[in-house]
Amino acid sequence: MNYLVMISLALLLMIGVESKRDGYIVYPNNCVYHCVPPCDGLCKKNGGSSGSCSFLVPSGLACWCKDLPDNVPIKDTSRKCTR
């Protein structure tokens, strides 16, 4: 029984777990993408399921994406946009 648990744990660690999250998609400098080009295409191109235009204070209209993978950066409210 212990071998089965250890093998299962090892397989889980080897495979990895990819989570999906929602948020404002950003450039590497934590600045949001604005709504041009259309957000749905941008979000899908980056692995999300859909996207829409939403208002974010103080950035203005920005792309909100659903189900983005972990490797795509989303807005970190603790950091400023650095241009």
From Swiss-Prot:
Disulfide bond as UniProt keyword: yes
Disulfide bonds: C31-C81, C35-C53, C39-C63, C43-C65
TM annotation in the entry: none
InterPro entries according to UniProt: LCN-type_CS_alpha_beta_dom, Scorpion_toxin-like, Scorpion_toxin-like_sf, Scorpion_toxinL, Scorpion_toxinL/defensin
Compartments in which it is found: Secreted
Signal peptide: 1-19
Propeptide residues according to the Swiss-Prot or TrEMBL record: 83
Similarity comment text for this entry: Belongs to the long (4 C-C) scorpion toxin superfamily. Sodium channel inhibitor family. Alpha subfamily.
Physiological role: Alpha toxins bind voltage-independently at site-3 of sodium channels (Nav) and inhibit the inactivation of the activated channels, thereby blocking neuronal transmission. Is active against mammals and binds with high affinity rat brain synaptosomes.
UniProt protein name: Neurotoxin-1''
Gene source species: Androctonus australis
